[in-house]
Amino acid sequence: MSDNTVLAPPTSNQGPTTPRKGPPKFKQRQTRQFKSKPPKKGVKGFGDDIPGMEGLGTDITVICPWEAFSHLELHELAQFGII
């Protein structure tokens, strides 16, 4: 055997033959879909059952959201974007 024989892979000036792909791209959803329904509001108005408030009616809207959703916890309100 001769000592001049070198076993080496053929050298090439080019890169790999398959193009390299970057990380996968994910599409952002435009709207958020909740699997459960948002909570229902509690009592909205005072009503005629409070003495001295008879003329106000029952469609008085609550200004503060925590009054309308007083039966829920804060994490439940945040889950549905109420607060």
Curated annotation (Swiss-Prot):
<protein>
    <recommendedName>
        <fullName>Retinal cone rhodopsin-sensitive cGMP 3',5'-cyclic phosphodiesterase subunit gamma</fullName>
        <ecNumber>3.1.4.35</ecNumber>
    </recommendedName>
</protein>
<keyword id="KW-0378">Hydrolase</keyword>
<dbReference type="GO" id="GO:0042622">
    <property type="term" value="C:photoreceptor outer segment membrane"/>
</dbReference>
<dbReference type="InterPro" id="IPR006952">
    <property type="entry name" value="PDE6_gamma"/>
</dbReference>
<dbReference type="GO" id="GO:0045742">
    <property type="term" value="P:positive regulation of epidermal growth factor receptor signaling pathway"/>
</dbReference>
<comment type="subunit">
    <text>Tetramer composed of two catalytic chains (alpha and beta), and two inhibitory chains (gamma).</text>
</comment>
<keyword id="KW-0140">cGMP</keyword>
<comment type="similarity">
    <text>Belongs to the rod/cone cGMP-PDE gamma subunit family.</text>
</comment>
<feature type="compositionally biased region" description="Basic residues">
    <location>
        <begin position="22"/>
        <end position="43"/>
    </location>
</feature>
<dbReference type="GO" id="GO:0030553">
    <property type="term" value="F:cGMP binding"/>
</dbReference>
<keyword id="KW-0716">Sensory transduction</keyword>
<dbReference type="GO" id="GO:0045745">
    <property type="term" value="P:positive regulation of G protein-coupled receptor signaling pathway"/>
</dbReference>
<keyword id="KW-0844">Vision</keyword>
<dbReference type="GO" id="GO:0043410">
    <property type="term" value="P:positive regulation of MAPK cascade"/>
</dbReference>
<dbReference type="Pfam" id="PF04868">
    <property type="entry name" value="PDE6_gamma"/>
</dbReference>
<dbReference type="GO" id="GO:0007601">
    <property type="term" value="P:visual perception"/>
</dbReference>
<feature type="compositionally biased region" description="Polar residues">
    <location>
        <begin position="1"/>
        <end position="17"/>
    </location>
</feature>
<comment type="function">
    <text>Participates in processes of transmission and amplification of the visual signal. cGMP-PDEs are the effector molecules in G-protein-mediated phototransduction in vertebrate rods and cones.</text>
</comment>
<feature type="region of interest" description="Disordered">
    <location>
        <begin position="1"/>
        <end position="51"/>
    </location>
</feature>
<dbReference type="InterPro" id="IPR037030">
    <property type="entry name" value="PDE6_gamma_sf"/>
</dbReference>
<dbReference type="GO" id="GO:0047555">
    <property type="term" value="F:3',5'-cyclic-GMP phosphodiesterase activity"/>
</dbReference>
